[in-house]
Amino acid sequence: MDRLFGLVQASAALEGCTLDIEQCGLLLRDGVSSAGKTISEQLLCMDLRDGYLCAQQFARAREFWSAYRIRSVADKALRNSGGGAPAAGTEPALQKICSLANTQRLHPVEGRSHEVYRASFEIHYLVSQHRIWGPLSDMMARLLMNWLQFECGLEPTVIRKGVIKDYRRVLGSATSEEIGEIFVSFMSDHEADPDETLLPKPSSREQILTLLKAHPWMSTNDLAKEIGISAKGVEKQLGILKERGSLRRVGPDKGGVWEVL
């Protein structure tokens, strides 16, 4: 699920959302909002998560792509952003998207991963070019791109910080000049690397829970040395974890153990 949250956070950030990966994880996993974040950007993340979950459900069920199923995904992803109804006159583009996806999913992916990636990038281009969902078309384009990648067992493409400027520039040029190959070629040069991690280093809280699950007797100083933060910082994180019901102390401070809940 954290991998999915990484996709949501990266895509929402391109739409102006300021939640970082840890804040996004807290919101989507635990329902905990972060101070200073607007309701609209938090709703955007939650709706986008629901859209991704719907797409993953269709992918696991091996459901054929159709305008109806795409609309079902969009209705969830854009629930608080105007709804998932496609713009008037975009039905031919939706049918072409479905045809592209269904052609790829009918054949074994082995030995054809590059071809499938190219098809997913073309789907992205078509959504963006035809502005099927208005100003949020690019966000939906990334979702549909990832949907096909999910279904075909490929590593989902995420637009990383280092390529955001080029991504926007190339996408803008491709759509204005109506030359999809410009964008598809650019994206093909940035296909997801299975050896790359989608998410940054786990948070200190995640590391604490992992360590205590394996070694429940570890002390605050032990945790601090292992994680690389101060003992005071560990104590603060332990307090937060206990308040959230993720952790509890069994027995006395000296001689007791931690229990991960």
Give, region by region, the residue ranges found by the protein language model.
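FIC/Doc superfamily catalytic core
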Residues: 1-261
